[in-house]
Amino acid sequence: FLFSKKKNMHLAISGNIGSGKTTLTKKLSEHYKWIANYEDVENNPYLNDFYKDMQRWSFNLQVYFLNSRFRQVIDIKNSNKTHIQDRTIYEDAHIFAPNLHTMGLMSSRDFNNYQEIFNLMDEFVKGPDLLIYLRASVSTLVEQIQKRGREYENSIRLDYLTRLNERYEAWISEYSKGKLLIIDVDDINFSENEEDLGNIIEKIDAEINGLF
């Protein structure tokens, strides 16, 4: 490990709903002794309502996530330790909010308002040192979502996941905020298979050691 060059790195894991971000964040934080910053799903006051009525609650939910993620990024920036973040502020702004707008689930004035808030925040935000993208097919996502059995996710539609996946691929293809590591998760099981996790860790080591 050549961590001595930079003690306070910022790594982030991106990917669609059910791609395994939270699981990998936990495993990597345990392995490297990094601080994990999770997505705020437990305390989020809008999530249940959003999945019942997306149109009504889309703006509220997205602003909540944006605020929560911005706070995380500021905390990471001011920290002298290495952090690994479960999803980035860019996914909120470039994938989830535009998708809701395109699907007619967020009005244009709300979307424009949202974009203005993000653009302001973006001036204070730097991309992570390394972004790890978990690429998964829709069938893998559905399988994972069903396996973890979060009640509010039962109503997620296939076309919603498909559109998100398309937006993820478009975003990743143009990503330029820092180093990028893409991991195809369809044929691996890092949550239960130590060898699969070990392979991911090797790739991350190579990226980190080449960073500085």
Q: In which residue ranges do the predicted regions lie?
A:
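Glycine-rich phosphate-binding loop used to anchor ATP phosphates in small-molecule kinases
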Residues: 57, 61-126
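P-loop (Walker A) phosphate-binding loop of NTP-binding proteins
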Residues: 16
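NTP-dependent small-molecule kinase module
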Residues: 142-212
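Post-Walker A alpha-helix
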Residues: 24-25
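Hydrophobic anchor at the beta1->P-loop junction of P-loop NTPases
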Residues: 13
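A glycine- and Lys/Arg-enriched "phosphate-lid" helix/loop adjacent to the NTP-binding pocket
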Residues: 95-169
